[in-house]
Amino acid sequence: MNASLRYFSLAALAVAFSSTARAGDSYAVDPVHSSVSFMTSHAGISYIHGRFNDFSGKFVIDKADPAKSSFALAIKVESVDTNNQKRDEHLRAPDYFNAKQFPLMSFQSTKVKKVEGGYEVAGDLTLHGVKKEITLNLKGADKVVEFPKGTPRIGIVTTTVIKRSEFDMKTALEALGDEVHITIGAEAVKE
């Protein structure tokens, strides 16, 4: 990620978290041990799989008052990778992500509820200039491990389905399908 976009991503996350004083433990996403992947239909007979290679995030876990916990993720759209350079370039173009105009997609929690095995997290997903409220069921975040020793970290996993058309991404809906299945697996290191 270039320096200015990385600064923008971190600044956006800092602003998101500064709006409310939060207690709890703060964790930064470790991109080396995390992934943001997706799949969508191809011609209704198979699936195209892809991932985003450049992202950052921050989680605040407040075990005493889980409603004060928060989750944020910023993804550099230009880092889309479907293992096909020509297709990736097309996905970055105005027909799809329009990466020059909308360089980031992001999720920022607005409400967190502790549930068995994890958290139910409502928040705003911003993609292609459109902000939409979604709810994620995050598994994990309760178990803290020290690996390597002295480095506390947590992990979360979530899957969701969004519709491209709801984010004004309507090109080739018949060929590629409207539904996009997203999986996020993230390890985060205590700050």
Predicted ranges, named:
Residues 1-9:
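Bacterial N-terminal signal peptides that target proteins for export
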Residues 7-8, 15-22:
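C-terminal segment of classical bacterial N-terminal signal peptides
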Residues 21-191:
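Low-complexity, acidic/polar, glycine-enriched regions of mature
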